[in-house]
């Protein structure tokens, strides 16, 4: 997973609340056996509308999604995070996230930045007044910068640390490799073992 420190990209105003994971990527797009290639399913039912924000320039090149409250609710669907990332998003800003979505985002390298709803409304206004406005999100300082506006965001310390270090679940496990190997070496010979295949 790529480490996340600071990201600057075009802001995309998604003026919708209660966006669940089925709206982010419908189930029909979940048949892949790989972890990439889900961008075509992102907001698929909404993208059929030519006036949908991701069909409009410059928002079609955005990488900072500014969404309404309760983004990513519903079923645990890692594909929702993967679809956002495959499309090019590195950050989603909202006043509230679904708990499972927030966890999946942090594990995959997508920053879910929680900003007060007044801050979200201000970002929408700024983006719509200046389409193509670049937003900078600084994880170290935990702030969002849009023009002269600086807004704090919330994220739990553990997820922030994982993102800053670029640690997915496998990388976290490998940090304990010495302890794992020591445990395996001390494991009694008379107990069952799982042996590597050759």
Curated annotation (Swiss-Prot):
InterPro entries: 3-IsopropMal_deHydase_ssu (IPR004431), Aconitase/3IPM_dehydase_swvl (IPR015928), AconitaseA/IPMdHydase_ssu_swvl (IPR000573), IPMI_Swivel (IPR033940), LeuD (IPR050075)
Presence of keyword S-adenosyl-L-methionine: no
GO biological process per UniProt: L-leucine biosynthetic process
Keywords from the named record: Amino-acid biosynthesis, Branched-chain amino acid biosynthesis, Leucine biosynthesis, Lyase
Domain of life: Bacteria
Pathway noted in the entry: Amino-acid biosynthesis; L-leucine biosynthesis; L-leucine from 3-methyl-2-oxobutanoate: step 2/4
Official protein name in the record: 3-isopropylmalate dehydratase small subunit
Keyword flag Mitochondrion: no
NCBIfam families recorded: leuD, PRK01641.1
GO CC annotations, alphabetized: 3-isopropylmalate dehydratase complex
Function: Catalyzes the isomerization between 2-isopropylmalate and 3-isopropylmalate, via the formation of 2-isopropylmaleate.
Enzyme class: lyase
